[in-house]
Amino acid sequence: MRLRSSFRYWTYAVFSVLLLSGAAWLVADWQKDADEAWQQAAANLLMIHGGAAMLALMALGALIPLHLLRAWRARKNLVSGITVAIVNALLIVTAFGLYYLGSETVRPWMSWIHIGTGFFLALMIPLHIMLGRRARA
């Protein structure tokens, strides 16, 4: 189920900002003990990442009726679509855990799951798009 190009490109941009800000934060976080500038960069990148996440939640909410439900009824691109939906749900749950759970025991696990899942989503979205275009052709 093809999306209107303006919404499609906006969604691509939001998820690109999420990926880039998350990856850049990871680098800054690893370097934060080396220099105070890295610590400040990590904080700024986390704010950008959080803001982009809010926009991504809006995009995901719009995608449910505009794309997901229509594709589900048409039985198109189900495996990769369900995978993308589950991965996004896992990212939302782990982000919630990172932000709101104060447990120092759970936090490292939640962080690594969130990071790994985020990079997996960066692979799944282009795959989902490619499979959808191939099925339509």
Describe the role of every protein-language-model region.
Residues M1-A137:
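Membrane-embedded alpha-helical bundles that constitute the cytochrome b-like, heme-associated redox core
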